[in-house]
């Protein structure tokens, strides 16, 4: 197949081997293990997964599918579809955030220009659509939800992207790096505002994330991975020179 199987329980439902965009985040463990005494083949698996995902998991404009399905016998690509997004062809914000973070991370480990170029492509689409569809620097859960700016927000996607941009700005050339850093800082400012801070409302840091909108689950909620990437982004920004 060239990718890691994500959901064995859905092989029959989806009609093949399935890989979700979230899996890009897991490749860091393979790279780290290969670099720290593990089997070097783990690195090959990670690179092959990133290559295959780059080839089949994205539309021409750089927008991603949540799920890619492959034939279980010969491995050919069958279809791209959504699971947690609005539609198969829509721009689900958190899925795109996994792609941005994932390819920035793959470039960190490989230093292969093709991965940096692709990270910037998927990032630039996200930033463009964000400005078209949101009233601030935190996206609506899916940028093609017909409710537009009235759709639920997803702070978790903003946290993932902010952290990724603070890494990506180191690798991007000149003006683009400055654009990425400024965007990340604006995201963190919004996330740190009264609109998104939980304060004494619950034990989380952040409000207004969306987990699985189609299933009616975790809509306008506090989600632990939003807090995780929010803290990671803040730490990355603090480590930079002013």
Give the positions of each predicted feature.
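Glycan-recognition and catalytic cores of secretory/periplasmic carbohydrate-active enzymes
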Residues: 1-242
């Amino acid at each position: 197949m060239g990718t890691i199987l994500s959901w064995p329980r859905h092989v029959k439902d989806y009609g093949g081997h399935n890989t979700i965009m979230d899996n890009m985040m897991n490749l860091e463990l393979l790279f780290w293990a290969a670099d720290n005494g593990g089997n070097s083949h783990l690195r090959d698996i990670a690179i092959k997964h990133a290559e295959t995902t780059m080839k089949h998991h994205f539309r021409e404009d750089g927008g991603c599918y949540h799920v890619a399905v492959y034939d279980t016998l010969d491995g050919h690509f069958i279809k791209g579809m959504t699971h947690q997004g609005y539609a198969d062809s829509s721009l689900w914000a958190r899925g795109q955030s996994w792609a941005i973070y994932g390819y920035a991370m793959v470039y960190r480990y490989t230093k292969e220009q093709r991965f940096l170029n692709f990270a910037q492509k998927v990032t630039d689409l996200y930033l463009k659509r964000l400005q078209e569809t949101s009233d601030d620097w935190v996206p609506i859960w899916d940028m093609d939800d017909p409710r537009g700016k009235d759709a639920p927000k997803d702070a978790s996607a903003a946290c993932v992207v902010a952290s990724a941009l603070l890494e990506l700005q180191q690798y991007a050339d000149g003006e683009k790096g400055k654009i990425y850093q400024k965007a990340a800082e604006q995201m963190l400012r919004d996330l740190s505002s009264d609109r998104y801070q939980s304060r004494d409302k619950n034990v989380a840091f952040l409000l207004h994330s969306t987990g699985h909108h189609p299933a009616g689950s975790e809509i306008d909620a506090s989600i632990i991975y939003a807090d995780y990437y929010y803290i990671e982004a803040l730490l990355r920004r603090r480590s930079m020179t002013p």
